[in-house]
Amino acid sequence: MAETAVAMRKRLEAYIDLRRELKMQALRLDQMRQTVGDVKSPRYEPGKASATPGDAVARSVVALEALEERVAELADREAEEHDALERIICRVTNAQQRALLRLRYFDMMEWPEIAFSFYGDRIDYITEERDYVAKCYRLHTRAVSSMCTVRRRMIA
């Protein structure tokens, strides 16, 4: 079944979401690694048994290992989808469309940044930035359409 432009956009947005999730979980993992050995000072509460500091460390290590596994899974999924998208993008015939897709989805640039990278050297860029961003939107629409065409050819 051929992908429609709507389905391709959803796929690209899902890829961005996957990249963001991977980045956030990797940051969380780094933070957890920095604090895994920290033991909180026990509070004395009469009549309550307190857990030993070793229990907290053991739980932290188990949580750290689980998060490491999750980050590795996300990284594998991201790499697979990156490769699949790159195979499609490299077959798009228009160089500017390829560049836009890579800037947006692989470099995670926002639209004004993309517009500046394409048109920032123009004399009227500052006053007409909105028009240049809109031009990028239109180019993106054509690029997604081109990706759908490429995908149909790859499947056939």
Task: Give the ranges of each region predicted by the language model.
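Helix-turn-helix DNA-binding module
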Residues: 108-132
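Hydrophobic, well-ordered secondary-structure scaffolds
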Residues: 77, 83, 101-102, 114
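Short amphipathic alpha helix immediately N-terminal
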Residues: 92-110
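N-terminal interaction/assembly modules
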Residues: 1-92, 119-124, 138-156
